[in-house]
From Swiss-Prot:
Consists of three domains: the N-terminal catalytic domain, the editing domain and the C-terminal anticodon-binding domain. SUPFAM superfamilies: Class II aaRS ABD-related, Class II aaRS and biotin synthetases, YbaK/ProRS associated domain. It catalyses: tRNA(Pro) + L-proline + ATP = L-prolyl-tRNA(Pro) + AMP + diphosphate. InterPro entries: aa-tRNA-synt_IIb, aa-tRNA-synth_II, aa-tRNA-synth_II/BPL/LPL, Anticodon-bd, Anticodon-bd_dom_sf, Pro-tRNA-ligase_IIa, Pro-tRNA-synth_IIa_bac-type, Pro-tRNA-Synthase_IIa_type1. This is Proline--tRNA ligase. Its main location: cytoplasm. Homodimer.
């Protein structure tokens, strides 16, 4: 490709509304342009990267035995009504009617469509298992689109759906998809973790997220420093302390604390170690309980894990924190003065709290705390559960090493769905025993457009994008200095351009009448991995300057060797 026949569209300045680095660089590198809130046009450079991501995804899905299909973006409302998600999905589901007043949706996902297809196409267990995938546009009417294509309203996604007659068969496909996803993100040159994830409202028996590690990520990714253990923060288990509870050394004392309504204020005003404090949170009890609220206790420097807490049998779902009015109606004290002693409702304490002695907590009297509380002496040990977020340095749940926590961007997610959609849409086949059998499903998604942004968040410097070789828009940039004045430079540039293309290498020849500084800046901004610079001074010695974008190293290579050198660098 020649720049004279290409839309480069680079920007010198960073647009003011671009918050994260990927959004900034995608705009500056001429990859995307905003059309409306959460809607982007992909320009040629962006499309080239997008297609490379698509191709890697497609190759590995095919290698894993999945079959490609293509389903409509526009879906009839009756399928969503049949599955029950017409009411459940909420305002992110864009609904409209056609000229015949028939209701439709713009698909945010395709479980209903693929299940409808399968219930009409398959009739026997002999046709299974099957795994179908597509790379298709999705639309979710996000309330606040942000971060460019990281959280846009329209996006490209690879979604796959597998169908089975047994859990064992589903597990085999799930494992194959796990392996395929690992290959996909490894081939793209991304630093990622496959983490255990909560199945949430989708349900099912297993779920993994694939997280690209990046400072700008919205998720906390937890992983061991010595093993393969990894989970998202919601699911990571906080192990109980190994050391036995220390013996009591203090008497329980009622202390006036009128100005200490938070743990931070208590610690500061009374010079307490925060590890010797406990905070008490009240949430609504499950419907039908004999008590309206449940008290949850975590150590003062720990955070309640709301996903874990919601799974407690006595806690209402979704998790709902009690208002001050509701708290006072039950405990007769405000939120800043709560604790386990004389608590009139069920109490659940975290494993770490169970191992504490001589600790401070609210006295369930406004403006007062108890200091020197000890379990089984001052208050009976209540139910113990893992209800906190892990912190860096905690022991790994698999017994190997300690936990680290980094920010991550979710680029893929795999689920064992079970029979949620197949039951709702009555998708079944004749089983081996001749009876009707509801199908078991798995679903597997990759945010294709999000992968592009995530790759940038992990690969950039002060000059621009530093693409992993596998997804760079071009492999080689040829920068001929004063090409339009030097016949020798022009002739060699054309010769190398032809020879490299003949080797199957993607080349961008910068044949613009631009200053060298502009040419260098644009190629570094776009992030092309390999650059060769042709200039009369070096050619006097039969040399060409080569620069590798990732480390910035330059070297002189003989004119006759440059093509073989580049082929070796790119193809190995």
């Amino acid at each position: 490709m020649r720049t004279s026949q290409y839309l480069l569209s680079t920007l010198k300045e960073t647009p003011a509304d671009a918050e994260v680095i990927s959004h900034q660089l995608m705009l500056r590198a001429g990859m995307i342009r905003k059309l409306a809130s959460g809607l982007y046009t992909w320009l040629p450079t962006g499309v080239r990267v997008l297609k490379k991501v698509e191709n890697i995804v497609r190759e590995e899905m095919n290698n894993a035995g999945a079959i490609e299909v293509l389903m409509p973006v526009v879906q009839p409302a009756d399928l969503w009504q049949e599955s029950g998600r017409w009411e459940q999905y909420g305002p992110e589901l864009l609904r409209f009617v056609d000229r015949g007043e028939r209701p439709f949706v713009l698909g945010p996902t395709h479980e209903e469509v693929i299940t409808d297809l399968i219930r009409n196409e398959l009739s026997s267990y002999k046709q299974l298992p099957l795994n179908f995938y597509q790379i298709q546009t999705k639309f979710r009417d996000e309330v606040r689109p942000r971060f460019g294509v990281m959280r846009s309203r329209e996006f490209l996604m690879k979604d796959a759906y597998s169908f089975h007659t047994s859990q064992e068969s589903l597990q085999e496909t799930y494992d194959a998809m796990y392996a395929a996803y690992s290959k996909i993100f490894s081939r793209m040159g991304l630093d990622f973790r496959a983490v255990q994830a909560d199945t949430g409202s989708i349900g099912g028996s297993a779920s993994h997220e694939f997280q690209v590690l990046a400072q700008s990520g919205e998720d906390d990714v937890v992983f061991s420093d010595t093993s393969d253990y990894a989970a998202n923060i919601e699911l990571a288990e906080a192990i109980a302390p190994k050391e036995p509870r220390a013996a009591a050394t203090q008497e329980m004392t009622l202390v006036d604390t009128p100005n200490a309504k938070t743990i931070a204020e208590l610690v500061e005003q009374f010079n307490l170690p925060i590890e010797k404090t406990v905070k008490t949170l009240l949430v609504k009890a499950v419907e039908g309980s004999s008590f309206p609220l449940v008290a949850l206790l975590v150590r003062g420097d720990h955070e309640l894990n709301e996903v874990k807490a919601e799974k407690l049998p006595q806690v209402a779902s979704p998790l709902t924190f009690a208002t001050e009015e509701e708290i006072r109606a039950v405990v007769k004290a405000g939120p800043g003065s709560l604790g386990p002693v004389n608590m009139p409702i069920p109490v659940v304490i975290d494993r770490t709290v169970a191992a504490m002695s001589d600790f401070a907590a609210g006295a369930n009297i406004d403006g007062k705390h108890y200091f020197g509380i000890n379990w089984d002496r001052d208050v009976a040990t209540p139910e113990i559960a893992d209800i906190r977020n892990v912190v860096a340095g905690d022991p790994s749940p698999d017994g190997q090493g300690t936990l680290q926590i980094k920010r991550g961007i979710e680029v893929g997610h795999i689920f064992q769905l079970g029979t949620k959609y197949s039951e709702a849409l009555k998708a079944s086949v004749q089983g081996e025993d001749g009876r009707n059998q509801i199908l078991t499903m798995g679903c597997y998604g990759i945010g294709v457009t999000r992968v592009v942004a995530a790759a940038i968040e992990q690969n950039y410097d002060e000059r621009g994008i530093v693409w992993p070789d596998a997804i760079a828009p071009f492999q080689v940039a040829i920068l001929p200095m004063n090409m339009h004045k030097s016949f020798r430079v022009q002739e060699l540039a054309e010769k190398l351009y032809s020879e490299l293309r003949a080797q199957g290498i993607e080349v961008l020849l910068d044949d613009r009448k631009e200053r060298p500084g502009v040419m260098f800046a644009d190629m570094e901004l776009i992030g092309i991995p390999h650059t060769i610079v042709l200039g009369d001074r070096n050619l006097d010695n039969d040399d060409i300057e080569y620069k590798y974008r990732r480390n910035g190293e330059k070297q002189l290579i003989k004119t006759g060797d440059i093509v073989d050198y580049l082929v070796k660098q790119i193809k190995g």
